[in-house]
Amino acid sequence: MMQEGIKAIKILYLKYKSMRKAITSIKEGVIISTRNEHSILLSKYGQDNVLKIAQLHHDHNFKKKYIKDFREKYTKIDYFVLLTEQLKEEIETFIKEKNTDMKCVVIPNFLDVNEFSEKNFEKEKTVIAIGRLHPVKGFDRMLRIWEKISKKHPEWQLKILGGGEEEEKLKMLVKELHIEKSVNMMGMCNHDIVIEELEKASLYMMTSYSEAFPFVLIEAMMAEVPVVAFDVRVGPKAIIQDGENGYLIEDKEEEKFIETMEYIMSHEKERVIMRKKCVKKAEELCEDVVMEKWVSLIENSRKMK
């Protein structure tokens, strides 16, 4: 056991040494880091003539370690790229007076619109949910909510795409709730199948307890699928325009969630109107739009170096 621990420490040290060497060897240009530990090294060892950009691809969730690092160990980072405006505002509050040189900017992930067919989508009475079957994703409460919905809407199906540690537990819950006929747990699916199922679905259901920037919601909107989601701390609110391309439900308000789902499931005309607004939102996050933000950031910043 001790030998394994020593071996792991050696590997980590060699990775650290290799990363430090790579960073110091770059005399000019741009370095973009996507992990906290790498961003710390970039701040410490990056050359003055190098544009140093850090990214955060998840919610910091107010963890003291992250906040301390942003304030004290990112001081030579030029730009910190965040996924949402809310994360940007929070981090700016954390670092003020401690890290005054680093600038925070918002650049979301982009969507490849070419993955989707150009034909008119033929929608089915299907609600879809996609993600890893992990406790934080809230699939347990999704099934309990669906159990109540399915009693009034037996003609609708819930399809869950994804695998993970809770798969067997959730399958057991489906049986306990007697919703086997209306729930299809499809397991892990390749991306082509995910897109195909999105194109057929009429609604997307998200019951996560925590999210960062749920990219799957952008994919849903490109497939003209309105979303109903709990308004957790960050994530869904950055994508969903309440009442326009979906609905945000106050977290834990399960009865309101059920009521909203039943309303939209019963009103096809409303869904059709929302579908067009979904596409408009998704197009704001297409590759060309997002890449232009990156190009602009890098080109304008290098002029100042």
Q: Model segments located where?
A:
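Carbohydrate-associated surface elements
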Residues: 86, 110
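A conserved mid-protein helix/loop that constitutes part of the nucleotide-sugar donor-binding site
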Residues: 125-154, 158, 165-172, 255
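Nucleotide-activated donor-binding/catalytic signature segment of Leloir-type glycosyltransferases, i.e.
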Residues: 171-189
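Short alpha-helical donor nucleotide-sugar binding micro-motif in glycosyltransferases
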Residues: 188-189, 196-201
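Aromatic "clamp/platform" in nucleotide-sugar-dependent glycosyltransferases that forms part
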Residues: 209
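Short hydrophobic beta-strand element within catalytic cores of glycosyltransferases
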Residues: 226-230
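Conserved acidic donor-binding segment of nucleotide-sugar-dependent glycosyltransferases
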Residues: 241-243, 247-254, 263-268
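A short, well-ordered alpha-helix in the C-terminal region of glycosyltransferases
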Residues: 256, 263, 270-284, 293-296
